[in-house]
Amino acid sequence: MWNQFKTDEYQGMLAETVTMPGNQGDLIHAYLSRPLGKGLFPGIVLIPHAPGWDEFYRETSRRFSQHGYIAISPDIYCRFGHGAPEEMAAKARAAGGVPDDSVVGDCEGAMKYLRSMPFSNGKVGVIGTCSGGRHSFLAACRVEGINAAVDCWGGRVVALKQELTPAQPVAAIDYTEKLACPLLGLFGNDDRFPSPEQVNRHEEELKKYGKDYKFYRYDGAGHGFWYYHTEAYRPKQAMDAWNKVFEFFGEHLRS
């Protein structure tokens, strides 16, 4: 994954905030980054996590672009207002969460936005961490045309009936039969949200329907082990997971 470039080759990147059509045609903000130079590039939709549409997702978008992907992260919280990322995420939680239908619609809009670019190769993947991991799986099941999906420790994929809400009226696992693209799952064995037992249950459902998936579980890692700005960060496990993400997207979006 690292240092896969020649020291004399051109490298450049454009990163900016754009406006794109989201769910039901709503105009929403999104953070877009893309490589400059020759070539047609695959696209990736990054779905924000529970802490908000934050700096981590901007940095992660640029990391993907450094490796040759057009990356876009839609502001799924924008309908709750504008301000500091954590404030908007808190507003969403207080209101019962961002409705699944809204997030799925925003992801579909982001996918179409990427495909409309003249430098797109036409293939688009989706990835998210935490609640964004759950939404990544949902989008892969409900949005036609996604080519690959990564679920990073998405909680509430497995949910009891009493845990469902007006914003999340259907357990994500109940859409498994409709999954129409390869899925990569990354989980920490010390996590409780999702717990190893919930990951097992999700895997059982994927096997039941004969889906194309790979799950990796990391000992000594809990929720958010990618987050280098938190105490949850586990460098060894995080770097292995990053390598698996780039291998997975490389296989399904570049060929």
Features from the language model and the residues they span:
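N-terminal cap/leader regions of alpha/beta-hydrolase-fold enzymes
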Residues: M1-S255
